[in-house]
């Protein structure tokens, strides 16, 4: 759902509500009726501190060799959420190439673009100029803020922060993306309707919690617990 620079998305990782004007967002576990709220710019630090707390609790009574193993895993996560230096961004040459290929996706004509990083094809995007989102969503700001909370996997965070990549939002809304691992994300349906402001707010019976508690619930769900209450919806 998108309206007045508010965005709501739901998936396997939970429910996200983004407020571009306040540069804040909400991450909710609806089955547990809990949520975390914070600023885009503070998420990486908050995530790091929460994960550090959880790992510390988990490893405190483990043998030394297992502590080393988990600390190594933790360091890899730290690296994924560490903001790269400007020199790292500048060292990557990002080039956007337009093509003459078009395709209808969810009823909208979409043009294919290719993203090359240091001469290597890293991503393909199908972008539609036919969806009138400009009055409801600042696409460039949304893309930049989303980059603040996404992990830096295989250099994605770096090139997605380049001016050439962010300027691609001027071409329209991304209807399909395929990365260099073949992972595809695609829009399957577009509807235009008036959305109540309350749809972008947490219900009164939801409890605000720390990010560490929300992560614990996510880890419980991914560990294979079969109960509905302990899994992400």
Where in the sequence are the language-model features?
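Extended soluble regions of mature proteins
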Residues: 1-233
């Amino acid at each position: 759902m998108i309206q007045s620079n508010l965005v709501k998305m739901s998936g396997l990782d939970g429910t996200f509500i983004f407020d571009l004007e306040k540069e804040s967002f909400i991450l909710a576990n609806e089955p547990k009726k809990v949520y975390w709220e914070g600023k885009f710019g503070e998420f990486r630090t908050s995530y790091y501190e929460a994960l550090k707390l959880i790992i510390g609790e988990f490893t405190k009574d483990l043998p030394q060799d297992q502590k080393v193993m988990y600390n190594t895993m933790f360091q890899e996560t730290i690296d994924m959420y560490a903001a790269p230096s400007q020199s790292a961004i500048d060292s990557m040459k990002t080039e956007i190439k337009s093509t003459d290929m078009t395709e209808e996706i969810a009823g909208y004509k979409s043009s294919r673009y290719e993203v090359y990083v240091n001469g290597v094809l890293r991503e393909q995007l199908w972008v539609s100029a036919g969806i009138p989102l400009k009055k409801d969503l600042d696409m460039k700001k949304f893309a930049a803020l989303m980059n603040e909370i996404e992990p830096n996997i295989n250099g994605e965070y770096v090139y997605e922060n380049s001016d050439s990549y962010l300027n691609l939002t001027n071409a329209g809304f991304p209807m399909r993306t395929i990365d260099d691992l073949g992972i595809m994300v695609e829009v399957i349906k577009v509807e235009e309707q008036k959305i109540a402001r309350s749809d972008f707010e947490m219900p009164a019976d939801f409890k605000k919690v720390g990010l560490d508690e929300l992560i614990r619930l996510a880890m419980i769900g991914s560990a294979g617990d079969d109960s509905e209450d302990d899994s992400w919806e």
